[in-house]
Amino acid sequence: MELSELQGTIRRTYGDRDWSRGLDGTFRWMVEEVGELAKAFRHADHAELTHEVGDILAWLASVASVAGVDLEEAAERYAHGCPTCGNIPCTCPVA
């Protein structure tokens, strides 16, 4: 599935709720899902990890839509490797 297709599907499915909730509320829901992913890491259950990553991806699409950001355009920043050094793999110094 392309990012634009995902964003469109999520917008059609949840867009009215997302707009009613607003950017702040939608972002907070996404952060909750990040917490659920952290719990899934502790359990090391692949199916649970996959589920939570999918939820975060869906919420990120919602946040992007409410903020007026196109996911395809945002992802383009990484299309040719590291946006800082321009290399694949990244050769930036590790902080």
Model-derived segments and spans:
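Flexible "arm" and connector segments at domain edges
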Residues: M1-V53, L57-A95
